[in-house]
């Protein structure tokens, strides 16, 4: 897969930020208006992310895009 390391990094940052905010996968998924299983796949790095999806997650976490990709 192309960009495996980058996808893994972004996925782990999403998980890390979610935990810092004391949110469950279900709670963040609700804030993002997505299924819990979809967010679980994102955090596990098992799906390709779009910029739109990353921005939705950033908004739900109340962080900037830079906080996810730094």
Predicted segments, located by residue:
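A detector for short, charged/polar N-terminal pre-domain segments
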Residues: 1-9
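Short basic helix-loop element that most often maps to the first helix and adjoining turn
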Residues: 12-30, 56, 61
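Conserved hydrophobic/aromatic packing and binding residues within compact polymer-binding modules
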Residues: 14, 28-29, 39-42, 68
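Recognition helix of helix-turn-helix/homeodomain-like DNA-binding domains
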Residues: 33-47
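Short, basic-rich loop-to-helix N-cap that marks the start of a DNA-contacting helix
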Residues: 46-56
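Short C-terminal boundary/hinge segments that cap the last helix of small helical domains
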Residues: 51, 62-70
């Amino acid at each position: 897969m192309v960009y495996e390391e980058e996808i893994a990094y972004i996925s782990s940052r999403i998980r890390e930020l979610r935990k810092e905010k004391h949110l469950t996968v279900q709670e963040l998924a609700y804030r993002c208006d997505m299924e819990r299983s979809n967010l679980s796949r994102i955090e596990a790095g098992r799906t390709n992310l779009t910029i739109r999806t990353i921005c939705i997650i950033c908004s739900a976490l109340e962080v900037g895009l830079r906080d996810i990709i730094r």
